[in-house]
């Protein structure tokens, strides 16, 4: 088997669409920010994207709304999510949509664990294994995981326990059909009065607002609650009259009290890494610089 791989020097949505159109690309690995850019692009109709037959999403949780949007844009393509990390192979699970005999995919599912590995979910505080459908830290064990971090025994010891389980730092759960669902990064969870709030969940809701083209959620220190969720949003062209209260009310109607957005900051663009991941540390720095001590 053989295939041609197209590489882009940097991401630009119109360049991506033009490459697919020109070269009749068939397989597209994407991350959620690229899915967002595709779904929000006003120029999508200018390109023939019918050659796409497989869309694989990874790198971060893909919200149901974005997943549904992508399916609508590419009705003839197989769409699924996968999960993995460099330290472990890297592929750990893959959507059942890509199986030899495809199975209907549940929204948000990342598929089942690969055959040469074991997976379990543990309580991040106690290390005890958790039952199905209960969120905790994802742990993986198998011959494919790394031996350790080069010249960093301390980091290796924190990551791989005495029984050989690699603690991924990701929060997720396994359902009754052995499928994995990702919630968020453990270190990204916002701790509000003992409750845990996943930024990815709020970001997915924010992106359903018709006036928001991009969004990110990070914690802000709060004397009473410990931490509260705050949002950085990019407003779509033509909606400059959008207010902070409008966005806060939009979220409040859909979530329990401890997940409500405390503040909204308007920004020109969400800072992201070359792979499309949100640079949350940059946003936390903006908060530290703008909020009075």
Curated annotation (Swiss-Prot):
Which Gene3D superfamilies is this protein grouped with?
3.30.300.30, N-terminal domain of ligase-like
| This enzyme's EC code(s) | 6.2.1.12
**Keyword annotations:** ATP-binding, Ligase, Nucleotide-binding, Phenylpropanoid metabolism
What SUPFAM superfamilies does the annotation carry? Answer: Acetyl-CoA synthetase-like
The record's region (SBD1) falls at 12-81
What does this chain do? Answer: Carboxylate--CoA ligase that may use 4-coumarate as substrate. Follows a two-step reaction mechanism, wherein the carboxylate substrate first undergoes adenylation by ATP, followed by a thioesterification in the presence of CoA to yield the final CoA thioester.
Task: Identify this protein by name.
Answer: 4-coumarate--CoA ligase 1
């Amino acid at each position: 088997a053989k295939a041609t791989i197209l590489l882009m020097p940097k991401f630009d949505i119109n360049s991506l669409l033009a490459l697919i159109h020109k070269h009749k690309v068939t397989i597209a690995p994407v991350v959620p920010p690229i899915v967002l850019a595709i779904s929000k692009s006003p120029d999508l109709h200018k390109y023939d994207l019918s050659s796409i037959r497989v869309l694989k999403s990874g790198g971060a949780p893909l919200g149901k709304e974005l997943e549904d949007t992508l399916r609508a844009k590419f009705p003839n393509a197989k769409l699924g999510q996968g999960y993995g990390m460099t330290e472990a192979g890297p592929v750990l699970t893959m959507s059942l949509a890509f199986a030899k005999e495809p199975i209907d995919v549940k929204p948000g599912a990342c598929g089942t664990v690969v055959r040469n590995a074991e997976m379990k979910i543990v309580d991040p505080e106690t290390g005890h294994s958790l039952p199905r459908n209960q969120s905790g830290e994802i742990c993986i064990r198998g011959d494919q995981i790394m031996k350790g971090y080069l010249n960093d025994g301390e980091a290796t010891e924190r990551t791989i326990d005495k029984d050989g389980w690699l603690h991924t730092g990701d929060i997720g759960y396994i359902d009754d059909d052995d499928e994995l669902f990702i919630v968020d990064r453990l270190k990204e969870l916002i701790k509000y009065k003992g409750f845990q709030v996943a930024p990815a969940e709020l970001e997915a809701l924010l992106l359903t607002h018709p006036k928001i083209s991009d969004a990110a959620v990070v914690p802000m220190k709060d004397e009473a609650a410990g931490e509260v969720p705050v949002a950085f949003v990019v407003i779509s062209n033509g909606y400059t009259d959008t207010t902070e209260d409008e966005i806060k009310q939009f979220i409040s109607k859909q979530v329990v009290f401890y997940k409500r957005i405390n503040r909204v900051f308007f920004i020109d663009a969400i800072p992201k890494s070359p792979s499309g991941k949100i640079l949350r540390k940059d946003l936390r720095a903006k908060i530290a610089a703008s909020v009075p001590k």
